[in-house]
Amino acid sequence: MGFSRGGQIALYASMRRFQKLWNESGIEIAAYIPFYAQCYAGYIDDSDVSGPIRLFHGVPDDYNPIAPCRNYVERLRQSGKDVQLTEYADTWHVFDSPTNPITPTALPAAQTVRNCVIKEDRPGHLINATSGEPFTWQDACVERGVHVAANPIALKATQDAVKALLTTVFKLE
């Protein structure tokens, strides 16, 4: 389970290629649960995943917009993977935080790659697909200015969904 950039890690940890590289223990992860993940990076063999994968995302999220996650989830579904994207209307980035106000709050200094297309052209090497150069946080596609807001209704729905998933994968009933 991970949130925002941690959600990106939770999502891409499902890739078998990364599991082979980094999982020396041999322990398998029961489920991958990314919250409002950034799905912009196209990795080599990124359709070869284990699962289940359950993503939770707000539709108006302008930090990590939902469209790339929709596209990635559709690609995974077409290849027969166990993946679901739960979308919440009127739900912004970090919707699960009780310290955020309910009304969208601007974070003008926060960086986002919402306008970037990032691809892995060889193992471990990410490029800005527009320029063909190695991706950096100084690239022109990197912007500042996002919004966050709590959504207690989406939080409760997500808690229920995660509980149901974990009950199933750990056979708790």
Could you say what each language-model-derived stretch is?
Residues 82-173:
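C-terminal catalytic histidine-bearing segment of alpha/beta-hydrolase fold enzymes
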Residues 1-50, 62-63, 67:
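Primarily recognizes the serine-hydrolase "nucleophile elbow" in alpha/beta-hydrolase
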Residues 33, 56, 84:
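Conserved Rossmann-like nucleotide-binding pocket used by diverse enzymes
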Residues 5, 9, 68, 72, ...:
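Stable alpha-helical elements in mature extracytoplasmic
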Residues 35-38, 59, 91-94:
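Active-site pre-Tyr helix/loop in NAD(P)-dependent dehydrogenases
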Residues 14-19, 77-81, 167-171:
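Sec-exported extracytoplasmic/periplasmic mature domains
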Residues 55-57, 61:
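Short beta-strand/loop motif that positions the catalytic acidic residue
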Residues 65-75, 100:
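Short alpha-helix in the alpha/beta-hydrolase fold that links the catalytic acid
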